[in-house]
């Protein structure tokens, strides 16, 4: 070593690096243990205690009763009922049919302002409305009679 200057500190650094690597590798090695293997957990049965000293079937029963009570409450609130007899089915059908006919009739009724006269409304506006609307046969006959009466008065 006398021939290589500075070899002493280099050997020390190399030895330290080798020691760190060996320590890392040694930490990854698995040492066999002499302890017996861990016992398997008992199988899950209906008598298994889940929590609060309640068995599994207790928990399932309480949960299903809770879900059933929610379903019954919602059906009562929204009036969901299955008809049981033929009469009830036919009555429900007729009721829906009558409701549909009623709504169809309501759609054909014109708005209230078209059915009644508004006080203070100009007669010119009324005439414009008549021109904009579709004339019926009765309106045309009345207009023809008025025109004929004017012509007869004009001739006399």
From Swiss-Prot:
Highest taxon in the source lineage: Eukaryota
Region (Disordered): 113-135
Keyword Signal attributed: yes
Locations listed in the record: Membrane
Topological domain ranges for the Cytoplasmic compartment: 79-156
Spans traversing the lipid bilayer: 58-78
N-terminal signal peptide: 1-27
GO biological process, one term: sensory perception of sound
GO cellular component: membrane
Topology of the protein relative to the lipid bilayer: Single-pass type I membrane protein
Extracellular side: 28-57
Pfam family for this entry, one: TMIE
Keyword Endoplasmic reticulum carried by entry: no
Known tissue expression: Expressed in many tissues.
Keywords, sorted A to Z: Deafness, Disease variant, Membrane, Non-syndromic deafness, Signal, Transmembrane, Transmembrane helix
Cited function: Auxiliary subunit of the mechanotransducer (MET) non-specific cation channel complex located at the tips of stereocilia of cochlear hair cells and that mediates sensory transduction in the auditory system. The MET complex is composed of two dimeric pore-forming ion-conducting transmembrane TMC (TMC1 or TMC2) subunits, and aided by several auxiliary proteins including LHFPL5, TMIE, CIB2/3 and TOMT, and the tip-link PCDH15. May contribute to the formation of the pore.
Subunit details: Forms the MET channel composed of TMC (TMC1 or TMC2), TMIE, TOMT, CIB (CIB2 or CIB3), LHPL5 and PCDH15.
Reported disease: Deafness, autosomal recessive, 6: A form of non-syndromic sensorineural hearing loss. Sensorineural deafness results from damage to the neural receptors of the inner ear, the nerve pathways to the brain, or the area of the brain that receives sound information.
Protein name as catalogued: Transmembrane inner ear expressed protein
Annotated organism of origin: Homo sapiens (Human)
Gene symbol of the encoding locus: TMIE
